[in-house]
Amino acid sequence: MELNSIKPADGAKHAARRVGRGIGSGLGKTAGRGHKGQKSRSGGYHKVGFEGGQMPLQRRLPKRGFKSHLLKFNAEISLTALENLGLAEVDVLALKNAGLVGELAKVVKVIKSGEISKAVKLSGITATAGAKAAIEAAGGSLA
């Protein structure tokens, strides 16, 4: 077998149906769209969510919550990412330089996701209770 000899099995591919090309084709004149009506016109279809004038579901349901504008200043980093960073001392600037947190991040929190075996000293970074225990068990510290 060679790459240039690979082809689909017989009958696997169907030719595209050419519509609107004369009565002999069986799909001439109205091209399978029937007579008149919105769906027979070009561009004739309702927008997504339109329910024929009835109040759409998206507007019937109540609004809930809001998106905090502070989220862009907060960042999370996993224990695995901290381990792979390979630095003995880590601060927010080091994480920004490594591309692990965004440029706007002001508060960084380590979450317990994965494992850590190297001793890492964190400064200016917070951690969850589980992550703190894992870092200290590996010989690291939080300042």
Curated annotation (Swiss-Prot):
Compositional bias (Gly residues): 21-31
Region (Disordered): 1-54
Sequence similarity: Belongs to the universal ribosomal protein uL15 family.
Keywords in alphabetical order: Ribonucleoprotein, Ribosomal protein, RNA-binding, rRNA-binding
Origin species: Acidovorax ebreus (strain TPSY) (Diaphorobacter sp. (strain TPSY))
GO biological process: one example: translation
Function: Binds to the 23S rRNA.
Cellular component GO terms, alphabetical: cytosolic large ribosomal subunit
Name the record gives this protein: Large ribosomal subunit protein uL15
Signal peptide range: none
Listed SUPFAM superfamilies: Ribosomal proteins L15p and L18e
GO molecular function terms listed in the Swiss-Prot or TrEMBL record: rRNA binding; structural constituent of ribosome
PANTHER family: 50S RIBOSOMAL PROTEIN L15, LARGE RIBOSOMAL SUBUNIT PROTEIN UL15M
Family matches, as Pfam families: Ribosomal_L27A
InterPro entries membership: Ribosomal_uL15, Ribosomal_uL15/eL18, Ribosomal_uL15/eL18_sf, Ribosomal_uL15_bac-type
Subunit-level organization: Part of the 50S ribosomal subunit.
